[in-house]
Amino acid sequence: MMQKKIDWSRDFIQKHQQLFACPYCHAAIETIDGYSLVCTNRHRFDINKKGTLHLMKQKANEDYDAELFTHRYELAQSGFFNPLLDEVLSLIPKQENQLIVDIGCGEGSPLAYLSSFLETIPLVGMDIAKEGILAASNHHAQKALWIVADLAQLPFKDESCGTLINMLTPSNYKEFNRVLAPGGKLIKIIPGSNYLIELRQQLYKSNEERQHYSNEDIVERFKQEYP
């Protein structure tokens, strides 16, 4: 019989409790009280029945609805991202107890795909969109711990993460550098200039400027941070 989602998440956090930090005060998670995480300053975070966890100060982003994540899930299940994810997999160090975090995981399909090859490594998928994390829990229960969190305030201790995956989403290099362990790896996937060009050409037929995309600023910023 499959373990309940809420129990699986509690057990995962208990096993890796030393990796997490309070998003309010950055203190250590001191205890697991039933289905709640409690930091040393008594801030409390409850695991819900879906097994997900809200680990950020503000309310979750509600700009993205469930329909968007349903379509993204369907695209992922078609195998569209698999060649890219195979390349990502080849870059991940296979070290047990080295936490891997997918920052901006959406509905979780990329990390769920990777989990099939990383069965002994702790995985966390995080996104600021509540609907994305709920979809991840619905489709990919027990593949990873799914949390609502903000990349500007990562709920992890300093030097606690072995690998960060940042796929087609914004970055916060200050936070990335804080949580990466010595020798840790950041894998950032940046769209190419022709990314979604067919859609842009259809959506912006009367605006040629918006039909084009440049990743030069993103690439340059990455090079500045990691010369």
Predicted regions and their residues:
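Conserved class I S-adenosyl-L-methionine
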Residues: 185-214
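A short acidic, Gly/Pro-enriched loop at the edge of an enzyme's catalytic core
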Residues: 152-163
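Class I SAM-dependent methyltransferase Rossmann-like catalytic core
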Residues: 10, 62-83, 87
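A short SAM/SAH-binding and catalytic strip from SAM-dependent methyltransferases
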Residues: 161-175, 190
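Class I SAM-dependent methyltransferase SAM/SAH-binding core
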Residues: 99-153
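Short alpha-helix
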Residues: 210-225
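A short glycine-rich, Lys/Arg-flanked "PGG" loop and its adjoining helix->strand segment in the class I
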Residues: 173-187
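N-terminal auxiliary segments of SAM/dcSAM-dependent transferases
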Residues: 2-61
